[in-house]
């Protein structure tokens, strides 16, 4: 903004004594004042703020002169030592000449007159070697993306003849050729030609080779793992005998067969005997014979209506904990009846467990069989009825009269 000129009015006049004292003090410390000049004609200064990119300063811009009355300016005091440029410019005139108030302002420049200042230094600008805008170089640039990919893969700069004489690329190509010639002179036997790029076939071959190596490593690791396994190794003779696998049917017996409690019912008693599943029933027969005080030949074991062989085992018979075996004690026979003609007849009661096998001579009446059954089953005094093939027996019949044979069944109802 322009600063308006200040007009100084006349000082207030005091008494004579004070004015004389002030003049005396001014005479001692100041230089003699310049004589006051009458009203002068000075040009009207136009105050303008100027903006410039340079460091030059212009004192003032003078417009059309006009007469402006200026008030009387007092003579300035002795110039003091100041670093300001305004004070130095004001003190340069002669002591007797009147001083003019000078105000420095910046010059407003036209945009076309603004000086061009480089942004980069000379060193930075020399390193920026840009490709010049030349039509010969533009012809070398491919227009299709496939050609661009081929050009980037090759990575070779344009030829030296296609470049303009002042191009930096030409200097670089010349230096590169000189280096290659030096290398050829130093190592004449060494082949410094660029290596050919691997084709897709070579890449696939390398891929298959890598897969083969991985398979070999996996196979070796598996072999090593089998060698370190805690399993027992068989001899090579046993391993290479036959490649066939033979399946053997049937259950394999465990090393330690388990024990279970076998229930044996004899008359009104129930005997619990711990036996092994692989143990034959002959041990049960011997135990029951010693328990009853009879000969083992007189002990008969029955499971339902089936006579059990002494050589059978609980595993083969599939006996469980809930199954019950009946033990029958056969009656003792006389010497004349111990012949090969004796009949072994089965007598079955109303209940399933009331079954007894009795040996009887063909000449003996059936009354003997009935009384023997009543004693063995503890049913003495009970009214029982015996039937053979639906015919009720009175006890007076003989086996030969009825045509009985060994293994025939006589039913008992009571």
Curated annotation (Swiss-Prot):
GO cellular component: cytoplasm; nucleus
Cross-link Glycyl lysine isopeptide (Lys-Gly) (interchain with G-Cter in SUMO2) per UniProt, renumbered positions: 123
Residues with PTM Phosphoserine: 52, 54, 83, 85, 87, 121, 193, 199, 309, 364, 385
Post-translational modification: Methylation at the N-terminus by PRMT1 modulates interaction with the NFAT complex and results in augmented cytokine production.
Entries under InterPro entries matching the protein: NFATC2-Int_DNA_Repair, Rad60/SUMO-like_dom, Ubiquitin-like_dom, Ubiquitin-like_domsf
Cystine residue pairs: none
Coiled coil: 170-229
Gene3D superfamilies to which the protein is assigned, alphabetical: Phosphatidylinositol 3-kinase Catalytic Subunit, Chain A, domain 1
GO biological process entries: positive regulation of transcription by RNA polymerase II
Main location: nucleus
PANTHER family attached to this UniProt entry: NFATC2-INTERACTING PROTEIN
Self-association and partners: Interacts with NFATC2, TRAF1, TRAF2 and PRMT1. Interacts with UBE2I/UBC9.
The protein's role, per its UniProt record: In T-helper 2 (Th2) cells, regulates the magnitude of NFAT-driven transcription of a specific subset of cytokine genes, including IL3, IL4, IL5 and IL13, but not IL2. Recruits PRMT1 to the IL4 promoter; this leads to enhancement of histone H4 'Arg-3'-methylation and facilitates subsequent histone acetylation at the IL4 locus, thus promotes robust cytokine expression. Down-regulates formation of poly-SUMO chains by UBE2I/UBC9.
UniProt name for this protein: NFATC2-interacting protein
The organism of origin for this protein: Rattus norvegicus
The encoding gene: Nfatc2ip
């Amino acid at each position: 903004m322009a600063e308006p000129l200040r007009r100084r009015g006349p000082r207030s006049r005091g008494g004579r004594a004070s004015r004389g004292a002030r003049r005396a003090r001014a005479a001692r410390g100041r230089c003699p004042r310049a004589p006051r000049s009458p009203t002068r004609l000075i040009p009207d200064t136009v105050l303008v703020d100027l903006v410039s990119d340079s460091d030059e300063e212009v004192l003032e811009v003078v417009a059309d002169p006009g007469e402006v009355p200026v008030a009387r300016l007092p003579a300035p005091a002795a110039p003091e030592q100041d670093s300001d440029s305004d004070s130095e410019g004001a003190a340069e005139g002669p002591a007797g000449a009147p001083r003019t108030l000078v105000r420095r302002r910046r010059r407003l420049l036209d945009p076309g007159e603004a000086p061009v200042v480089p942004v980069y230094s000379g060193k930075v600008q020399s390193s920026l070697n840009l490709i010049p805008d030349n039509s010969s170089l533009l012809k070398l640039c491919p227009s299709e993306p496939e050609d661009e990919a081929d050009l980037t893969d090759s990575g070779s700069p344009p030829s030296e003849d296609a470049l303009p004489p002042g191009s930096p690329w030409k200097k670089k190509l010349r230096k590169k050729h000189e280096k290659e010639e030096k290398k050829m002179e130093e190592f004449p036997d060494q082949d410094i030609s660029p290596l050919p790029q691997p084709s897709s076939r070579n890449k696939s071959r390398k891929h298959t080779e890598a897969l083969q190596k991985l398979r070999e490593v996996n196979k070796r690791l598996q072999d090593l793992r089998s060698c370190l396994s805690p399993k027992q190794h068989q001899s090579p003779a046993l391993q290479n005998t036959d490649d066939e696998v033979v399946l053997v049917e049937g259950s394999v017996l465990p090393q330690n067969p388990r024990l279970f409690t076998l229930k044996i019912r004899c008359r009104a008693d129930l005997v619990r005997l711990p036996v092994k599943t692989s143990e034959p029933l002959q041990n049960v027969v011997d135990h029951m014979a010693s328990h009853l005080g009879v000969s083992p030949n007189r002990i008969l074991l029955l499971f339902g209506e089936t006579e059990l062989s002494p050589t059978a085992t609980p595993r083969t018979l599939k006996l469980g904990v809930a199954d019950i075996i009946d033990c029958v004690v056969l009656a003792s026979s006389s010497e004349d009846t111990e012949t090969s003609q004796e009949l072994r007849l089965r007598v079955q009661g109303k209940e399933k467990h009331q079954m007894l096998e009795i040996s009887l001579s063909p000449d003996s009446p059936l009354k003997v069989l009935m009384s023997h059954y009543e004693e063995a089953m503890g049913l003495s005094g009970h009214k029982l009825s015996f039937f053979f093939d639906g015919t009720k027996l009175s006890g007076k019949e003989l086996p030969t009269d009825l045509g009985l044979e060994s293994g025939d069944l006589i039913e008992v109802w009571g």
